[in-house]
């Protein structure tokens, strides 16, 4: 495995040394988008991994990498489908085309990528959501052979995650339809949220999203969380609730442990919860201590021992990357500056490095200079002169995040979330961006030369 990861790094470096020049991350106005370049503001090398406009990497906690680390999957457009990137050669191959499919994730054990198939309605693409009241077919496609098999059909709702031994899928459905979005999506962006203030003025994208989410939360639509047996398609309900169940993630270590969220405006909900496939009493992971405190965009460490999340005390004022250790109960809060807040955070597989994808001035941090891809080191705040409080081990452990800017995202429109992920070897960050106009998938090298 180490040899494979090393070969990926060497190949990426050799391609960029031969082809890269210092260029700006600016819209190309009809010109060809460069295959590789050095960001003039950070000195880090960037590679465009995708070949086709409209290509996207997956959501930040959805696995896009084969277990062996040699390939990753992305979505492609025109025609809509799935492509595979060989991380040894950087060759991109279309794997499966269909206008009605979407990518869920790579299997953690097999060489299969899991897809959804949802028929279009009146010529419009139907996006997976918990409130969907029509069937979704789940397919598995082998990334080497292209062999396709049907896994299951769910009558309604959405599949969210797959467990680490690849025996179960998990999803949720609401008992009535509701659409957060107000019309067809612009392909350059993430979603379409529109709302007006009390005077009838259009709200910003970020504020409109809050309004639309609050409308959905207050409907208190009955929901169910369910598992799907990958071998035989059997479905089993594990949780019923009128809370808005969302962001469901199996533990990467325990095939029965499940993290999920109570969705809605973060300051109104206790968001992060644990349960299991047997429906054990849910455990709340973070308790609010002040009004307007928010926590969310939670994700697992790769060893499954910790849960990480964006914490703000209060919202939009003080920013932390927090974690909770399931084995020891230890909590760590890592402080960051306003401009370093990111839409999503992620971590390397060895747990040594963190990354963030930045944000624009309309988002919660109201950052003045936040449009960057960041690398973070966590630096603990140590006791003074080695003197500890008697109950130090029972207290939250403070730390700070030391940031390094990797990519200037000034020309990126954050209505498309970059969704950064570390490559399995920990040497690159993969993200999606519309910085040059069309959406493409890019990788930035963490090492600086």
Predicted feature descriptions by range:
Residues 24-47, 214-226, 388-397:
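Blade/loop signatures of beta-propeller domains
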Residues 25-36, 45-80, 248:
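Beta-strand-rich domains and repeat architectures in extracellular enzymes and scaffolds
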Residues 55-73, 98-119, 155-174, 202, ...:
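Conserved beta-propeller blade repeats
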Residues 80-84, 121-139, 178-184, 220-226, ...:
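Structural motif
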Residues 86-90, 142-146, 229-233, 276-280, ...:
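Short loop/turn segments that connect beta-strands within beta-propeller blades
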Residues 100-101, 107, 116-223, 237-240:
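Asp-box/WD-like beta-propeller blade repeats and closely related beta-sheet repeat scaffolds
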Residues 305-320, 335-402:
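Loop/turn-rich, solvent-exposed surfaces of beta-rich toroidal or solenoidal domains
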Residues 416-449:
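Blade-level signature of beta-propeller repeat domains, shared across WD40, Kelch, NHL, RCC1
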């Amino acid at each position: 495995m180490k040899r494979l990861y090393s070969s990926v790094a060497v190949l990426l470096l050799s391609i960029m040394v031969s082809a890269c020049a210092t260029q700006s991350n600016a819209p190309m106005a009809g010109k060809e988008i460069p295959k590789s370049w050095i960001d003039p503001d950070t000195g880090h090398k960037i590679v465009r991994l995708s070949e086709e406009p409209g290509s996207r990497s997956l959501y930040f906690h959805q696995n896009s990498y084969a277990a062996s680390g040699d390939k990753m999957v992305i979505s492609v457009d025109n025609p809509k489908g799935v492509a595979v990137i060989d991380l040894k050669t950087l060759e991109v191959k279309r794997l499966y085309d269909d206008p009605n499919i979407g990518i869920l994730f790579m299997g953690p054990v097999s060489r299969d990528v899991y897809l959804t198939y949802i028929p279009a309605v009146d010529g419009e693409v139907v996006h997976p959501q918990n409130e969907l009241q029509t069937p979704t077919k789940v397919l598995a496609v082998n990334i080497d052979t292209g062999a396709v098999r049907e896994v299951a059909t769910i009558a309604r709702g959405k599949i969210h995650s797959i467990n680490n031994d690849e025996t179960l899928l998990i999803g949720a459905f609401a008992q009535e339809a509701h659409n957060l979005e107000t019309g067809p999506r612009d392909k350059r962006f993430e979603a379409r949220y529109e709302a007006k203030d009390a005077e009838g003025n259009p709200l910003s994208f970020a504020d409109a999203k809050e309004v639309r989410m609050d409308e959905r939360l207050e409907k208190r639509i009955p929901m169910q969380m369910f598992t799907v047996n990958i071998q035989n398609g059997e479905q089993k309900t594990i949780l019923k609730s009128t809370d808005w169940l969302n962001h469901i993630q199996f533990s990467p270590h325990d095939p029965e442990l499940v993290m999920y969220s109570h969705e809605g405006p973060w300051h109104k909900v206790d968001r992060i919860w644990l349960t299991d496939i047997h429906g054990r009493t849910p455990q709340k992971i973070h308790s609010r201590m002040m009004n307007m405190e928010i926590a969310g965009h939670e994700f697992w460490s790769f060893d499954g021992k910790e849960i990480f999340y964006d914490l703000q005390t209060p919202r939009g004022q003080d920013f932390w990357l927090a974690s909770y250790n399931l084995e020891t109960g230890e909590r760590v809060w890592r402080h960051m500056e306003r401009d370093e807040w990111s839409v999503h955070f992620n971590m390397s597989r060895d747990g040594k490095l963190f990354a963030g994808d930045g944000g624009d001035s309309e988002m919660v941090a109201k950052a003045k200079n936040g449009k960057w891809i960041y690398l973070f080191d966590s630096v603990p705040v140590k006791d003074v002169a080695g003197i500890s409080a008697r109950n130090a081990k029972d207290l939250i452990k403070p730390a700070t995040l030391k940031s390094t800017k990797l990519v200037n995202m000034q020309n990126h429109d954050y209505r498309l979330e970059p969704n950064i992920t570390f490559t399995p070897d920990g040497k690159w960050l993969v993200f999606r961006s519309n910085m040059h106009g069309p959406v493409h998938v890019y990788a930035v090298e963490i090492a600086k030369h």
